[in-house]
């Protein structure tokens, strides 16, 4: 079903993947983070849209 076209192409792709040591970016600007108060407590408001 899946046939490998070239072993050199496969080796190049594997080397490209092996060079990526970082994985996923740990700094995501869109990610929501809970802010804690001085006592270490956090709160969130859950809103259900109509």
Swiss-Prot record:
Purpose of the protein: Binds preferentially to single-stranded DNA and therefore, destabilizes double-stranded DNA. It is involved in DNA replication, repair and recombination. Binds ss-DNA as the replication fork advances and stimulates the replisome processivity and accuracy.
Superkingdom as given in the UniProt entry: Viruses
Keywords from the named record: DNA damage, DNA recombination, DNA repair, DNA replication, DNA-binding, Metal-binding, Zinc, Zinc-finger
Subunit structure: Homodimer in the absence of DNA, monomer when binding DNA.
Lineage: Viruses, Duplodnaviria, Heunggongvirae, Uroviricota, Caudoviricetes
SS bond list: none
Any one GO MF annotation of this record: zinc ion binding
UniProt-listed InterPro entries: NA-bd_OB-fold (IPR012340), Phage_T4_Gp32_ssDNA-bd_sf (IPR044947)
Protein name: Single-stranded DNA-binding protein
UniProt keyword S-adenosyl-L-methionine, yes or no: no
The UniProt record lists the keyword RNA-binding: no
Other remarks on this protein: Interacts with the polymerase and the uvsX and uvsY proteins.
One record GO biological process: DNA replication
């Amino acid at each position: 079903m899946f046939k490998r076209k070239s072993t050199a192409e496969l080796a190049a792709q594997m080397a490209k993947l092996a060079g990526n040591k970082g994985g996923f970016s740990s700094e995501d600007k869109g990610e929501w983070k809970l802010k804690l108060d001085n006592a270490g407590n956090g709160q969130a408001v859950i809103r259900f849209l109509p």
